[in-house]
């Protein structure tokens, strides 16, 4: 995990540099072309100049030309002069026009001003007129007032005169003077009247003056008022404008305020959402912290268990003596054991294999030690070239006790007697670290006191029996407090069973017989205070197999949080070690098992029959109560033990390579839950129920992980599913089906050869990684799948049955080479592809034998996948019986010949289809493994380094074409997506209706020639998962995209199981056979390229109901007689439909250009079938990368199975015909055209030719334009 994390940035950088280089190449090409063009032009110009200089013209002609030139110059000057004059005139006219325009503007302005003044004068005149009228009226009124006053005055005068006349004369006294005369009185009164009138006139005159003055003042006031009125109107208008602008501003401000409020509200909502998200993250982190704390406690308990284990082994080594007749320096032992995780006080069942026993001081040649770390088992061993399967012996099931476990311990066959002894390993045995000696008990050897019911078969140590049942009972109350010295003072209440079933190498069955099995005192298990399941790989000499006792076995605890397993491998001659054991675990499981105190440390290798005992509810009541004091005491011992284990592995890596080691089968060890009976009084019933629910949920999650991430995990996943099924009913069904097939498995197990060998990795890395993650790391650790894959090939016969069951249930997973499954539920496609590319590059850099495929796997809490797992288990129980017969036939056919690919191709293809289908999600399918196996079986000159380059280049090819593929998928949905079951069934019926002769011919001939020609013949089976995965939805050969198991199951949830089973049963043989035919040519020489191409088109046309290949793949004997007809069909059809290929068709045709070293010459070719032939990279990418033809898996990219890149559905013309089902008529037409084509153009029967037909291949690739 960490190593790949370091390499991770290499992928995008590599891609970026690649595209930069391509761009630079294009620019350089254009630049060079331009330079070449300019050079040609310069050359022509130089030639022209030279010609002109060489041809000297006459002098007269020169003068004439000069005169003509001077005339032309004069004319040009005149023209320029005229032009200048015209320009001057134009400029003058423009100036005049500007002046006139300016004057015109002035006149208009003056007219406007005069008009304005005239209007104002008219208004003033009107006002004056109105004032004059008013004054006239005023004058008239005053005149009337004057006349009225005059009349009044006249009347007063008359009144006064009348009154004077009426007055009486008064006698006057006589005057001295005589009275005046009458005329004098008249004058006097006249004078008085004139004077009075004058005064009145003066008064009226003054009054008129005052009125006139008041009138003038009123006029002035009126003028002022008028001006004020006009100013007020202007102010009113201005205020109205301001009011309008203010209103607009107010509206704008209101809108802005509203927007601000809305934005503030949205921001508050966003912040609230962020706060909620942070709260959720906080809760999640809190839960993770709690889980980490629980894991830490769990690991402390595991440390304690390791310390107790160390104490136990030290006590054993000190107490038990050497019981071997002679030293066994030639023997090598590789043992690993399973320790129940958090069960320091549980029941320990120890199994021993009898070959040699020794004390700490005995010299033991150990070529391999393996340590099982938490969630990862790193075994530094390499498989030998003859991989065989051992036959496990089924122990009798015991149902009388409440807590039982069966420990299937298998032994490796004995090694050669001449093997040299390395002194380093003698020193290693003496080191004080976690050892468990498999010391057989003899009568003369002192033994701890054992009760009869503890060990039933103790005296059978020296007998070569297949299995020994060891029943031991330990006291619940004394498990945690008994020291290492008190071995025989305990009472035994719970019962555990451990049986040491041995696995015989088929190569040595005749002379070896049965291995010796020994028993280990259960009191030793009591001392260790931790349940353990141990199995050993004893490598001893063939001639000393029965006589010699087993050497001391080094055992290391599996410190996994839930289900762990460990198994060791033997080294091969190349001193390369397989380090690919990865246990699939989750933190949720670890925490749940820690809470309930129950350790589910069942092996991933085992039988389903023990599920009844594994799922007992009593196991949930056990709690591991181990004091912290003991934990602190054992921490240092555990760390020292792990350090010594790592050192031992590194030293063993440098041991002599002259030992010929035989890779025995991996062992199917099924360790039931090691129920630890401790103090359970503090637990309440509510707590127990809660823990049971949690355990059930975790177990379902583990099962779903095994089902979704790998349909058919190689034996370990099978056991995990068996062990983790939450429902007892499902467990019982699986157990019954497994028990029915158990006898057949035991009979046929020795006959099934190994398909592939594990990849080899550096043991030092594995040990360091193991040491890091054993005590501290609570994360899901990486699982090296190559050993699981190897164990799948060499393990129990139940492998093939389980594989077939799961394939029949439709859990189809495409393969992935050297990739990593991301630790998230939905991994990113680019990241996954880049990690895959990183692995390929690292494999190319490393030595060919040091290739290690590392896969990250995390079983997350996928609650939504629980239903899928339940359906899987139900289908598994129903289909298991039907598949057992086929599995037995497959194993019987494998016995006669080491080459699995030559005989009974159909059945074996089905088996290998299961094998490689299972490997898709949970581990990278190691093409190197099968390559190694084939290289030993068949002599070959191909190197693994070239194959690594092939892997790298093929991955690059398919990554580049994924973009075009995506676009084509969107445009061609009708041709590519869901073909319903009706069309599929009709297609299957038509395909199955063809004769069986052609099928047998093609299938058998292809595989036989592949074995003879190609070292990678075994790789043809690795692509069967592709066909198998694409079969239910009629999508064969999914080459660049993959679909997860959960997606596929969800697609098939609404389909009846009968339809699915029938569809699968019809599709499995033909899919596997087509894949074999196709991949044979992928791995073959250039002589078989045409056959491969035609076979590829056969698989293309299979789902378009045109090609008869799939209809004829039922037997395997006579392909040469029929191959030309089939190829002709493909040829004719390709001529008609090759132009309609979408760019989505990727990668399969690439390998056909095996030895073509030149680029495609036509850009039109590239535009039409560019991505189909992957010409963006070198054509020989597929010739070099044929091992990984179909392994460009991307779990994130392909979300839907119907959107995978498939042939047949992308052929537009053929897709319509496939939907219509008119295939028979089309095949007849194709046959007729085939006959004509063979007569006319026999050379075109090959789709892509070898070296001598490159031009013809170009014409084919360009669509026969």
Curated annotation (Swiss-Prot):
Residues 943-956 have a biased composition (Low complexity). Residues 1-16 are annotated as: Head. Belongs to the intermediate filament family. This is Nestin. One of its GO terms (molecular function) is CCR5 chemokine receptor binding. The gene is nes. Promotes the disassembly of phosphorylated vimentin intermediate filaments (IF) during mitosis and may play a role in the trafficking and distribution of IF proteins and other cellular factors to daughter cells during progenitor cell division. Required for survival, renewal and mitogen-stimulated proliferation of neural progenitor cells. Required for brain and eye development. Residues 17-324 form the IF rod domain. Widely expressed throughout the developing nervous system at 24 hours post-fertilization (hpf). As development progresses, expression becomes restricted to proliferative zones of the developing and postembryonic central nervous system. In the peripheral nervous system, expressed in the cranial ganglia. Also expressed in mesodermal muscle precursor cells and in cranial mesenchymal tissue. Residues 161-183 are annotated as: Linker 12. Residues 325-1265 are annotated as: Tail. It comes from Danio rerio (Zebrafish). Residues 65-160 are annotated as: Coil 1B.
